[in-house]
Regions:
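Amphipathic alpha-helical packing segments from all-alpha helical-bundle domains
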Residues: 74-81, 100-107, 120-147, 188
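Hydrophobic/aromatic-rich alpha-helical bundle segments in the mid-to-C-terminal region
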Residues: 123-127, 144-193
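Amphipathic alpha-helical segments enriched in hydrophobic/aromatic and basic residues
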Residues: 26, 35-36, 47, 51, ...
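Hydrophobic alpha-helical connector segments
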Residues: 63, 74-105, 156-163
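Residues in soluble alpha-helical coiled-coils and helical-bundle/repeat scaffolds
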Residues: 55-59, 63, 100, 104, ...
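Amphipathic, non-transmembrane alpha-helical scaffold segments
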Residues: 11, 19, 65, 69, ...
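Basic, helix-initiating cap at the start of DNA-binding domains
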Residues: 1-29, 33-45, 58-59
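Helix-loop "lid/cap" segments that line or gate small-molecule binding pockets
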Residues: 94-100, 109-119, 189-193
Length: 195
């Protein structure tokens, strides 16, 4: 017999479903075209469920980036393995697979950038979140270089900017010209950055 969820578990599940629906709707329609009604319907709830979990559409939008950046911060040790093992590693990232698997999120990430570029208040909110993520990445990279007994080619504080720029730039080009991306170019460029 299936045990009933507690009130707290139910709230967590509802919030997760709303965030998942928000990810789909915002990436499909864009921030400005997406509606709270559409997000609620996608999640199988009423609009009231959205407002009992988020103060506004913007709050839900920003909660999506917070959720993802928290996950990404936990995954940065994978970069350390890539640094240590090099391109021959079985742990080597596959940029094309990653970009295709994460297409919905990547579209949403671009929507975040557009949202921030259109309004100064929004820009400051996204900038603060990106700064936190870069800080975590910088700390992980510094620890990695120390552990490996190596010195980076670029100042540590420049590496998160460079790594993000490399990934976002190649991602944009890949979505427009998927067959044009040279095999392994992202991995080689990342390896060079992390020498």
């Amino acid at each position: 017999m299936k045990q009933r969820m507690s009130r707290k578990e139910n709230q967590v599940q509802t919030r997760k479903r709303l965030l998942d629906a928000g990810l789909e709707v915002f990436s499909r329609r864009g921030y400005y075209a997406a509606s709270v009604d559409e997000i609620a319907a996608e999640a199988g709830f009423s609009k009231g469920a959205v407002y009992s979990n988020f103060s506004s559409k913007e709050d839900l939008f920003l909660a999506l980036i917070d959720r993802r950046f928290t996950r990404d911060a936990r995954e940065y040790p994978g970069i350390i393995n890539f640094m240590a093992d090099g391109l021959q590693s079985e742990k080597e990232p596959d940029f094309k697979k990653f970009v295709m698997r994460d297409r919905t999120w990547n579209i949403l990430m671009l929507e975040f950038f557009l949202y921030a570029m259109r309004d100064e208040t929004n820009r400051e909110k996204l900038a603060a979140r990106l700064e936190q993520l870069r800080k975590v990445m910088e700390e992980n990279l510094a620890a990695s270089y120390t552990k490996l007994g190596r010195k980076p080619l670029l100042p540590i504080k420049d590496l998160p900017w460079s790594i993000f720029s490399l990934g976002v730039g190649m991602m944009l080009q890949f979505y427009v010209d998927p067959d044009g991306l040279p095999k392994g170019v992202y991995e080689r460029a990342l390896q060079h950055l992390l020498k």
